[in-house]
Amino acid sequence: ALGSSLASSRNLSGDFTDILVVLGKYAQAAGVSILIGIDELQYAEKEELEALACALHRVTQLGLPVMFCCAGLPKLLKMLGEAKTYSERQFNFVKVDSLPRDKAVEAIVRPAQKLDVHYSDEAVDAIIDYTEGYPYFIQELCSTIWISSDSRCVSLETVLECTSLTDIRLDEGFFSVRCDRCTPRQKEFLIAMVRCGELPCTLANVAHYMRRDVSSIGPLRAQLISRGLIYSAARGEVDFTVPQFDRYLRRTEQID
């Protein structure tokens, strides 16, 4: 009802700003704060990002207790800058990367300890080696271990047995949903990145393994960035947006 009574101008930025200002004033009067979470923000249209930036700018000016916590792929920083030039000053951009070793150990060990289950040191080392500290992979492997074992002490052998099962789970879900809709040419680009050996890799090397000119693969690069599969790591360089995507392609495409 609130939205329908306010959002009448058919201007997304203006309507969204009006709604947030009213919500912010209600929250301020009630002595509470509003936190709005948005995931996968890289899929937003430019008009939607403009509306977000405009609305946040206005509630900040008015000192209203409204905040956003957004998550997205690396290209999001550029997208927000293109939507509104002042966006880079509005948002605090935090890179979410692999956990440092001490935090990875804590993520593995502490939840299990609460249920009187313990990991051997060798098991913890193997989990960190496999996951490279990436939080989602830790979650998936430890979930597989939890389902597969009823022992109160998780051994190295148990971890090694579960890594192949976790590979299957990741391949059929996490990785495949990102790759299945690629065209043959786009997949060729991704495979060429893997053949480069080191990541990030240069576009020149990708073009070499595709046996094409650098200029001719530019559209494929742009398409894959738009799909959220790769990002521009530096000038003339690209990398995968998710860890171990190269391992997935090696497994599924039989890349030497």
Predicted feature locations:
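Conserved Walker B catalytic segment
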Residues: 5-74, 82
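Conserved strand-to-helix beginnings and helix N-cap segments that scaffold or border functional pockets
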Residues: 46-53, 105, 139, 186, ...
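Short glycine-enriched loops at secondary-structure junctions
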Residues: 72-77, 100
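Short regulatory helix/loop adjacent to the ATP-binding pocket of P-loop NTPases
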Residues: 75-91
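Conserved AAA+ ATPase "SRH/arginine-finger" region at the nucleotide-binding site
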Residues: 92-103
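Amphipathic alpha-helical "lid/sensor" segments that cap RecA-like P-loop NTPase cores
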Residues: 104-173
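C-terminal leucine-rich, beta-strand-based interaction scaffolds used for sensing/assembly
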Residues: 122, 168-256
